[in-house]
């Protein structure tokens, strides 16, 4: 599903964010990218999403070498992935329902499909009763659940979560990790970038 072959990323400043990375994440796995702040975790995610290009090496996603993928094909690559960011990136003027539905509008899903899929994924993340609320009315853990719901709503084969527990208290952090485990048990490949080694252990 994801394979890095001798991948190096060096920025124009000379900073080597990733050096000779070699790893494989198979379909259905739950994988962690672990390291302190500035260790290259976010760069790895950007490379997977093709937001950054490797300086050298090859990146294979779902059996396709993305190294020379045309820019016009990148949106199609990303449709196989759901991404939840540390800062949530929720739309403040839209309800929970509309924040999640927005990801479906972008891929031109039918209104009927949206009406069916959004309540289903909100139920999965435990937010059925919060659909009409706005982000500023939610706790940090609830906002993270909205971000996860939005990442999952288009049924991606892979979920990438960048520091999903970074802004949360310990109890809420474990709730989110349990949710990610449940998502993985349903067959979705899960990749979590984190600095919290206790969560990995």
Language model features with spans:
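Helix-to-loop junction immediately C-terminal to a conserved catalytic motif
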Residues: 49
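Conserved ABC transporter NBD signature motif
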Residues: 57-65
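Short coil-to-helix segment of the ABC ATPase nucleotide-binding domain corresponding to the Q-loop/switch region
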Residues: 94-101
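Conserved ABC ATPase signature
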Residues: 133-138, 142-144
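Hydrophobic anchor residue at the start of the ABC signature
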Residues: 148
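A short, proline-enriched helix->beta-strand linker immediately N-terminal to the Walker B motif
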Residues: 153-157
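Catalytic Walker B motif of ABC-type/P-loop ATPase nucleotide-binding domains
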Residues: 159-162
């Amino acid at each position: 599903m994801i394979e890095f072959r001798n991948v190096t990323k060096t920025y124009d400043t000379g900073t080597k964010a990733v050096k000779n990375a070699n790893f494989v994440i198979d379909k259905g796995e739950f994988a962690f990218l672990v390291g302190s702040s500035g260790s290259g975790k976010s760069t790895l995610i950007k490379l997977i999403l093709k937001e950054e290009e490797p300086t050298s090496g090859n990146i294979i996603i779902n059996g396709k070498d993305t190294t020379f993928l045309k820019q016009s094909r990148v949106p199609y690559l990303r449709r196989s992935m759901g991404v939840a960011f540390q800062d949530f990136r929720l739309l403040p003027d839209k309800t929970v329902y509309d924040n999640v539905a927005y990801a479906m509008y972008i891929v031109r899903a039918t209104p009927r499909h949206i009406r069916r899929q959004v309540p289903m994924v909100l139920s999965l993340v435990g937010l059925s009763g919060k659909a009409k609320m706005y982000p500023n009315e939610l706790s940090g853990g609830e906002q993270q659940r909205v971000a996860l719901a939005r990442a999952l709503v288009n049924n991606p084969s892979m979920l990438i979560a960048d520091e999903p527990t970074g802004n949360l208290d310990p109890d809420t952090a474990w709730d989110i990790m349990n949710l990610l485990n449940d998502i993985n048990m349903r067959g979705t490949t899960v990749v979590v970038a984190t600095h919290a080694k206790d969560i990995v252990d």
